[in-house]
């Protein structure tokens, strides 16, 4: 996953307005892409515990953003979960 190629595509897909780069939806989508990429890395490198810690931190940050979104805008929260194929 090259972040210079993938990041603008994700931002374009989930942005809420033209100059949006930091809304909760965009942040969750970017974190999900990084989490998915790191999960694949950890499947082949099982003993990479430093990366595993980073994965857990990213998952926790994503969970906090999703909780915020759920509290403040429930329709966007459910739509985002469906788009990203996330549970809960």
From Swiss-Prot:
Protein name per UniProt: Small ribosomal subunit protein uS15
Functional summary from the UniProt entry: One of the primary rRNA binding proteins, it binds directly to 16S rRNA where it helps nucleate assembly of the platform of the 30S subunit by binding and bridging several RNA helices of the 16S rRNA.
A Gene Ontology biological process term: translation
GO terms for MF: rRNA binding; structural constituent of ribosome
CDD domains: Ribosomal_S15p_S13e (cd00353)
Name of the gene this protein is made from: rpsO
Gene3D superfamilies: 6.10.250.3130, S15/NS1, RNA-binding
Protein family (similarity comment): Belongs to the universal ribosomal protein uS15 family.
Self-association and partners: Part of the 30S ribosomal subunit. Forms a bridge to the 50S subunit in the 70S ribosome, contacting the 23S rRNA.
Any one cellular-component term (Gene Ontology): cytosolic small ribosomal subunit
Name of one Pfam family that matches: Ribosomal_S15
Entry keyword set: Ribonucleoprotein, Ribosomal protein, RNA-binding, rRNA-binding
InterPro entries: Ribosomal_uS15 (IPR000589), Ribosomal_uS15_bac-type (IPR005290), uS15_NS1_RNA-bd_sf (IPR009068)
